[in-house]
Design a protein with these regions (language model features):
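Conserved ATP-binding N-box helix of the HATPase_c
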Residues: 1-22, 73
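Short beta-strand-loop-beta element adjacent to the nucleotide/active-site pocket used for signaling
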Residues: 23-33
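Short conserved segment of the HATPase_c
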Residues: 42-53
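Conserved glycine-/histidine-rich ATP-lid loop and adjacent helix of the Bergerat-fold HATPase_c
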Residues: 69-79
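A short beta-strand-to-loop motif within the catalytic HATPase_c
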Residues: 83-87
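Acidic ATP/Mg2+-coordinating residue in the GHKL
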Residues: 37
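Glycine-rich GHKL/ HATPase_c ATP-binding element in histidine kinases
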Residues: 89-91
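HATPase_c (GHKL) ATP-binding subdomain of two-component histidine kinases
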Residues: 94-95
Length: 182
């Protein structure tokens, strides 16, 4: 799953807060990825075309592949992509996947992804929530910044290392529980 690319869309849209949630409901068999932001949002016209790889709001290149790839990854597993956006309010992208499907791509290294987002965008806030069968873990950069007290930046490599380890340590018990680990 290309979570980093989707989250960077939020940053590029001026989001001050981006929420990334990954939910595994084994009984329903539907992993869900949701990225929601308070960025500038999209017009209804752009929102309707944004999953076209040749539709982009950028001027630097004429293609945008993050959302089209996420949509394709979801649909290959029997899932779907939903996008809600309002100008001046923000955007929410939700992708569902078929858990047991052979084409389900690995989630990837979410701890490094979230730590990297926090480190490279220290002036923005990110909330990462992992939920597995109703049990959740949340990493919130606002709480981390409060603990750091402004004396140490989220851009500090040692902070990024801590964030990655913190997410890994708290995610592992959720991801490895039960009869079939994710």
């Amino acid at each position: 799953m290309n979570v980093l690319d989707i989250a960077q869309n939020s940053v590029a849209a001026g989001a001050r807060l981006t929420r990334i949630s990954l939910t595994f409901d084994r009984a329903a068999g539907l992993p869900t990825l949701c990225v929601a932001d308070d960025g500038k949002g999209m017009s209804p016209e752009l929102a309707a075309r944004v999953t076209d790889p040749f539709c982009t709001s950028r001027k630097s290149r004429k293609v945008g592949l993050g959302l089209p790839f996420l949509k394709m990854a979801a649909e290959l597993t029997g899932g779907a992509l939903a996008l809600e956006s309002a100008e001046g309010v923000g955007t929410t992208v939700t992708a569902t996947f078929g858990l047991g499907h052979i084409d389900l791509a690995p989630v990837g290294d979410m701890a490094s992804t979230i730590a990297g987002l926090m480190q490279c965008n220290p002036d923005r806030d990110f909330v990462y929530t992992l939920t597995v069968d109703g049990e959740s873990f949340c990493a919130d950069s606002r709480e981390m910044k409060e603990i750091l007290g402004g004396e140490v930046s989220m851009a500090d490599p040692q902070v990024a290392l801590f964030v990655r380890q913190y997410i890994d340590e708290n995610s592992a018990p959720l991801l490895n529980k039960g009869e079939s680990a994710l």
